[in-house]
Amino acid sequence: REYGSGGHDVGERVAEKLGIVLYDKDDLAEKLKSLGDYEEVKSFYEERPANSLLYVIAREEDRKMNEKPFEQIKSITENQSCVIIGRCANVIFRNEEEHISVFVHADLEKRIKRIAGTNRISEKEAELLIRETDKRRDEFHNQYTGENWGDSRGYQLSVDSGMIGIEQTVQLICDYMEAKKWWRDCGRQGI
């Protein structure tokens, strides 16, 4: 989700509407801390990409290291319906038939107004914060997946929450889930 698009709020409301668990980076990190598995994957939960020079030199080792947090997320969430905010979940669960991946985005001006209002900062500060956060998320996603963050081909659904609002975004996601369930239950008959 783009920073300031309301993606976290959307995820919370979808989880609430469906009566399922929500996991964001803090929830997952807390779960791992309680299991004693946090320290070795700390940078994953802090959204810190590796140093770019080290990244190039140790790419193969990074791939092995990257598998660990993915395996942990699968283990934490297995056998339950849940909403996962971020954490490259679109890639982690890509081959799971039951998963739905959504990218929530919005026009920069709307995101600036939202962040300035919620954080009580100037619009100039909000824009800087948005650009820094989006850049960090892009680098993080690219490092851990090798894919471009926000590329619609990496998600089943990409929604502009700035155009339709948070509540309609939630409803659109729930409607999509119902349509996907219908399609699966009908045996995927061609149109």
Which residues are covered by each model-predicted region?
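Conserved phosphate-donor/acceptor-positioning beta-strand/loop module used by diverse small-molecule
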Residues: 95-118, 123-133
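Glycine-rich phosphate-binding P-loop
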Residues: 1-14
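Short, amphipathic alpha-helical "lid/cap" segments that border enzyme active or binding sites
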Residues: 70, 166-174
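C-terminal helical "lid" subdomain and adjoining coupling/linker elements of P-loop NTPases
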Residues: 180-191
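Short, polar loop motifs at secondary-structure junctions
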Residues: 86-90
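Small-molecule kinase domains that catalyze NTP-dependent phosphoryl transfer to phosphate-bearing small molecules
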Residues: 47-51, 122-167
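ATP-dependent small-molecule kinase phosphotransfer cores
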Residues: 27-81
